[in-house]
Every structure is written in structure tokens, then in C-alpha cells.
């Protein structure tokens, strides 16, 4: 029995020695994670897995590239919470806003220590939206009628076969207001701003990166390389030589090589979010 235990211990030590150089090497490197497109459950799973790898490999810095109009509330909150935990672990996190980082993209971004945006980045859209579809007249025209048996008056709220009642609208507004309060509070805390200051521009409007800097939502103006250099400086890494290691890459399908595949992918994302987000509270910029 004793010999067997010694054998197991020896095996464990060998495994540790195999992976130890990888961990040591990562301590002088920078991780990079991309949040691209609408924030959904799939986004959350991919990003959280990548963040766990950043922690396990002990990267001293993370460059978080965000190019997203936002998305579902819960998924945005879980990514934000994981970023804060990573910072508590000692990792320096810098967010780089790309073409757009709005609504849920902002929520994720304010978990970073510093935010860098292009002067023309579309950002902001701090607010909450909830949409349903009233198709009652359409159903009436084609002769479709619904019979509903429910346990309470609000169980079929946002049902497409009838308009909202005043009581339902008031109930949903309370839900929206609660989510809005959470959003504004997180932005105020993350950006070290007064709550009332944030509320003055958190009415759903969008603004450029240049405007966002004037409002205190963004620290510096610059491209992704500027953000990379800032992250390297914070982590005391070589700004000139450091090249980020991208984690959590999205798998590219063979169809992505076909002409027009990018446009098709974008349309698929929008349609998927419309279907998934119907009746859900969203932190999403809808142009």
C-alpha cells in the first residue's frame, strides 16, 4: 500500500513539473479575450472558460477586446462578476472598445481597471429594453384563437395573442426599473462616478468614444494596440515585445470561407437574438 501511494505521489509530481514551465511562462505574458457580437449564453460559456484559463495559467494581464451591442442581462452579469474575481486574483484587466461597445458591452467593460476606446467607437446605450409582440390582429385575420388556462393574472404576460393590460405594463416597468438600477449602480461603482452623474447620461443614448471620455466612461482614447501597451505597463511587462495570447477563440466553420458568409453570420446572430430575446429583459443597443 505504501509503495502504491509513493508511486501516485511521484506521478503527480511529474505532472506538476510538466505543466510548471507553462505556468511560469504565462506569468510574463498577456492574455487576450474577445467579446464579439451579441452577448448570449454561448458568449458567456466561451468567455468564462477563457477567464478560468487566464486564472489557472496566472497571466498577469488581460486585454479584453469588446465589439458588442450588448445582449442578455444574466450573461452580462456573470461575465462582469468573473472579471472582478480575476482582478482580485491580481490580474490587471484593460478593456478595448472596438467599433461598438454598448449596453451590455459597457456593463462588461466597466469591470476592467482601465477602458480604452477609439474616438469614433459607438458606446453608451446604458438602459434596459423589454419587447413583446402583439399579434392579436394577425391571428384574428387568419382565424387563430387561443384558449389559456393560468394560475394567476400575470402568468401569460407578453402573450402574443393579446395586448398588454395596464396592470401588466406597470409590473413590467417595475422589472425594468430594477434592472436599470442595477446597471447604473455598477457603472457608477466601476467608473468611480456619482450615481446621479451616471443617471444624467444613462437614458439609452449612444455617444462616441470621445464623448464617453469626457463623461468619465472611458479612460483613454486609442486603438487596441494602445490598450495592449497600457495593460503591459500596469503589469510591468515589456510594452514593445509583449504579444497577447488569444484565448477562447470562436470556432470557425467551413461555411465561413464562402463569399457573403460574414453577412449571413451577422443576420443569423440578429435573428437568433430576436428569437431568444423576445420577452426577455435585455441590455442591448438596437439601432
Residue ranges and their predicted role:
Residues 1-103, 108-118, 129-287:
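N-terminal organellar transit peptides
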Amino acid at each position: 500500500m505504501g509503495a502504491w501511494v509513493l508511486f501516485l505521489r511521484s506521478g503527480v509530481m511529474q505532472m506538476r513539473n510538466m505543466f510548471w514551465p507553462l505556468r511560469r511562462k504565462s506569468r510574463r505574458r498577456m492574455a487576450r479575450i474577445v467579446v464579439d457580437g451579441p452577448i448570449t449564453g454561448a458568449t458567456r460559456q466561451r468567455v468564462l472558460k477563457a477567464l478560468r484559463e487566464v486564472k489557472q495559467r496566472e497571466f498577469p494581464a488581460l486585454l479584453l477586446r469588446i465589439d458588442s451591442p450588448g445582449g442578455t442581462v444574466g450573461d452580462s452579469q456573470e461575465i462582469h462578476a468573473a472579471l472582478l474575481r480575476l482582478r482580485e486574483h491580481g490580474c490587471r484587466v484593460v478593456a478595448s472598445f472596438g467599433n461598438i461597445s454598448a449596453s451590455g458591452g459597457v456593463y462588461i467593460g466597466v469591470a476592467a481597471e482601465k477602458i480604452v476606446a477609439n474616438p469614433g467607437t459607438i458606446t453608451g446605450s446604458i438602459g434596459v429594453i423589454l419587447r413583446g409582440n402583439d399579434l392579436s390582429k394577425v391571428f384574428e385575420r387568419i382565424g387563430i384563437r387561443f384558449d389559456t388556462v393560468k394560475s394567476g393574472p400575470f402568468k401569460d404576460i407578453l402573450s402574443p395573442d393579446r395586448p398588454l393590460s395596464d396592470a401588466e405594463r406597470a409590473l413590467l416597468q417595475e422589472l425594468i426599473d430594477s434592472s436599470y438600477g442595477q446597471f447604473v449602480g455598477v457603472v457608477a461603482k466601476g467608473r468611480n462616478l456619482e450615481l446621479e452623474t451616471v443617471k444624467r447620461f444613462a437614458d439609452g443614448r449612444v455617444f462616441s468614444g470621445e464623448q464617453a471620455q469626457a463623461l468619465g466612461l472611458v479612460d483613454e482614447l486609442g486603438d487596441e494596440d494602445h490598450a495592449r501597451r497600457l495593460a503591459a505597463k500596469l503589469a510591468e511587462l515589456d510594452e514593445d515585445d509583449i504579444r497577447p495570447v488569444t484565448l477562447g477563440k470562436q470556432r470557425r466553420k467551413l461555411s465561413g470561407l464562402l463569399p457573403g458568409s460574414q453577412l449571413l453570420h451577422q443576420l443569423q446572430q440578429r435573428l437568433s437574438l430576436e428569437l431568444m430575446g423576445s420577452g426577455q429583459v435585455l441590455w442591448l443597443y438596437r439601432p
